[in-house]
Regions:
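Compositionally biased terminal segments of proteins
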Residues: 1-163
């Protein structure tokens, strides 16, 4: 599913400079299939258009990472094997450019987990919290996403100094 800050911003009808595109998959069989396609055919095996690669993909148990060149600019491309939480299937109609986005609950959970991992890294400029604020989740999605994140990381969710 299309996730990360870029998906959040686009889903809210906003725009910002983004130098990365993130996709998340939690289903083991689906990730195995994606890995095999990329190993056999490169990233081109996943797309309907030819890509200009900035670097060849690296594939491991955590994800598939590469960069693609768009108008001469390298854009980081990641398919993250999200093994911490089970991602819910997004509803039809939640697509951006034909790709379904994470559910609001999973957007909240993934951003809370990312913030907990990166809060001390000043180079991130607390972007995960900014993304959460941009998405303006309703109370149901916020509570459900927080519950998913707390189930994984415990009470450190919501208590990091940057929160």
């Amino acid at each position: 599913w299309f996730g990360g800050g870029t998906a959040i911003v686009l889903a809210n009808g906003e725009f910002r400079e983004s130098l990365d595109i993130d996709f998340l998959v939690s289903d083991q069989q689906s990730y195995r299939q994606l890995r095999q396609i990329v190993r056999d055919h490169g990233l081109g095996g996943l797309t309907t258009r030819e890509l200009v690669l900035g670097r060849p993909p690296t594939v491991d148990g955590y994800g598939i990472r590469s960069s693609v060149l768009v108008a001469g600019t390298a854009i980081k491309f990641e398919i993250i094997h999200e093994g911490r939480i089970d991602l819910d299937n997004p509803s039809p109609g939640t697509e951006i450019c034909g790709v379904r986005t994470l559910t609001r609950t999973d957007q909240v959970a993934s951003k809370l987990l990312a913030n907990d991992d990166r809060w001390a890294d000043t180079s991130t400029f607390i972007r995960d919290l900014i993304d959460l604020a941009m998405m303006k989740p309703d109370a149901v999605a916020l509570k459900a996403g927080a519950r998913k994140a707390v189930d994984v990381y415990g009470t450190s969710i919501g208590t990091s100094p940057a929160v």
